[in-house]
Amino acid sequence: RFIIQEGERVTKYYIHMNDSYHIIEPDYEWCDVYGCVNANFTHCPKEKYPKLVSLAPSFGIRYETNFLKAAINTMVTLSSVWKSVLRKSEWNKATQKNECNKKRNIKHFFTRRYKAWKNRLPLSAYDNEIKSEDDYVFFLSTLWYSDEWNQNDKTVNLRRAHYVRVCKSIPGVTFEGGLLGDAFSSNQLFADVYTDKRETFANWLEKTKRSAFVFNTPAFWNCHGWKLGEFLALGKCIISTPLSNDLPHPLEHGVNIHFVEENELSIREAVEYILAHPDYRHKLELGARDYWEKWGTPLASLNLLEIRN
């Protein structure tokens, strides 16, 4: 939540970063503009939710090169917001005391934010000056736990496994990566694509830049995976299964993305075609970066929310 005041005009904004497209009704009622990175106008039509604005997939960036400065800025902001909440809320004193004690846990606060700050990179790191390699493919992704509700083993896990198997089977291609899981997501169906080799984020980014192409598919609860935003920012040739949610502007097959069906044969045909047509690959790379600059950058997101300098 945030508020912008220009003269006497006050506009309240809420940014919905969740995996689900479901509108959070209390936040929708509170705000004037409801930005959502997983907007779905089929299930949440504009007629019912006129304040809903579709935003491009997001990912974390390091916005300060100095952690202490970043932490101080965050503390000042949170302090201001918290004072306002305490002053205006109708909570009882006991609740206020418990919540204040949580906020005073400075060690926990700094530990979490230092990890986030350390593991991410500035937006400038996505200005990709590394040329993609013709015969190198890197893909490292999550093998999600699956249950009767999310059924990830029949959707996102299976589609990612199809892609890894295809890339590993093509002669002349050096494939690196696989699916990372844990005790909750282990499944013998994916034993052949499982890896326990983790990468630092900096290494992941460098290897993704080198990769001939990348693979995207709707992730947990069919959300836009955060990697889709990163792939666009990096200007990668993206192979993708159909998207479940909306975007600020549709991606176009053959222009800024290569769409495939959700089966191994369709993925194989796409991989083989792109490997054989480097000019087409380069076209998709340029198209992806162009899409990002028009619809995905922080400035583009502000424009979508109609926030002007």
Annotated model-derived regions:
Residues R1-N222, L243-H249:
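Nucleotide-sugar donor-binding catalytic core of glycosyltransferases
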Residues L189-V193, W204-R308:
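Catalytic binding pocket for nucleotide-activated donors in carbohydrate/polymer assembly enzymes
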